[in-house]
């Protein structure tokens, strides 16, 4: 038997881009050949050495008439490469690829990377997203869920039968981090004093990641810890409001927003407490990244996050939109050294045991080989 050829279709960049690169890095190249069909948001040089072929077509996040053209182009590429498996990533590419693959003689797998119907949106949109997933579900053989919570959501919404769902927990590239360069970013680079207590978050400055809760929490922490500083690693459409809140409340000099960066872990290394206060979350990849860096975690008790974080074990959980609870959790990390050390130790153990990128690739390989038997 020759190599198994997988054709990946992906529209959304960001976290999905990072996931695919990590997945491809640890695939057995003696057994698998990978083709990437992606949107204009991807960079070909990022995939040097990871894929055998790179194809770029126009795919847009919004639903529209251009989707018909995207479907046609994906179908042409499926015919051109004749893969054993089409692997569709995220909801938009998932719909496009599954429709494009109808009637073709290969296997099809879909990974939503977080269900669109779990987003905080209008009931009308939620119903539309749910309907699209139900309609498209018969056109693939397996749906990969990145957490148990994602699988449960699919069952509750009756997207498909349980035997179509396969949980493959997300992971992080521990080897690359541990063998990489550390200390590239210094506190002084951000005008943060060396003795500052630094609280940080990594994520888009948008509704999902709750930067408004983070900055309100920051105000409460600053009132108790005068040398506290706060870092947001990311960019997004709420940045102006976040900066204005800090300015209006007198701590603008203590809030540092990096914008989009190539290496967020360089900034995570500065954190004394690491937050993910999301309003919804399919997995929360930054959580094992925090663990990998040895950071105590404060996270929201929502969706997949409790699958990763056990309150008082490898992190502290607070309710969604609970500004006071988040500030109290951060203050506990500041004040209780034994608790902080315990959270760090348990997190470090968990990330090595449960969230290693090699395991993610190996579980995919096993699934694909089983499908082709």
Residue ranges and their predicted role:
Residues 296-299, 309:
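Short hydrophobic beta-strand element within catalytic cores of glycosyltransferases
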């Amino acid at each position: 038997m020759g190599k198994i050829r997988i054709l990946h279709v992906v529209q959304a960049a960001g976290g999905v881009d990072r996931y695919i690169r990590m997945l491809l890095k640890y695939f057995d190249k003696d057994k698998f050949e990978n083709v990437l069909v992606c949107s204009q948001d991807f960079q070909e040089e990022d995939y040097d050495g990871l894929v055998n072929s790179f194809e770029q077509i126009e795919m847009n996040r919004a639903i529209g008439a251009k989707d018909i053209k995207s479907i046609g182009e994906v179908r042409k590429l499926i015919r051109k490469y004749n893969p054993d498996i089409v692997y569709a990533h995220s909801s938009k590419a998932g719909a496009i690829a599954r429709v494009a693959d109808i009637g073709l003689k290969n296997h099809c797998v879909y990974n939503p990377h977080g269900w669109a119907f779990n987003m905080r949106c209008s009931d009308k949109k939620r119903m539309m997203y749910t309907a699209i997933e139900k309609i498209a579900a018969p056109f693939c053989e397996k749906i990969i869920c990145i957490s148990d919570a994602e699988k449960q959501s699919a069952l509750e919404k009756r997207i498909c039968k349980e035997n179509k769902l396969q949980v493959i927990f997300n992971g992080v590239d521990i080897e690359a981090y541990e063998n990489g360069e550390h200390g590239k970013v210094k506190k002084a680079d951000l005008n943060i004093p060396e003795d500052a207590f630094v609280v940080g978050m990594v994520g888009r400055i948008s509704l999902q990641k709750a930067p408004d809760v983070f900055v309100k929490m920051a105000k409460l922490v600053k009132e108790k810890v005068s040398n506290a500083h706060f870092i947001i690693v990311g960019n997004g459409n709420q940045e102006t409001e976040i900066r204005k809140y800090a300015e209006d409340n007198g701590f603008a000099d203590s809030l540092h927003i990096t914008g989009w960066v190539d290496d967020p872990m360089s900034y995570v290394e500065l954190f004394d407490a690491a937050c993910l206060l999301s309003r919804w979350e399919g997995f929360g990849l930054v959580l094992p990244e925090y663990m990998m860096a040895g950071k105590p975690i404060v996270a929201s008790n929502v969706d997949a996050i409790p699958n990763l974080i056990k309150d008082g074990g490898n992190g502290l959980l607070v309710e969604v939109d609970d500004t006071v609870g988040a500030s109290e959790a951060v203050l506990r990390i500041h004040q209780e050294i034994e608790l902080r050390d315990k959270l760090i130790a348990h997190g470090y153990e968990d990330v090595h045991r449960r969230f290693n990128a090699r395991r993610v690739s190996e579980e995919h390989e096993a699934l694909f080989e089983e499908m082709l038997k």
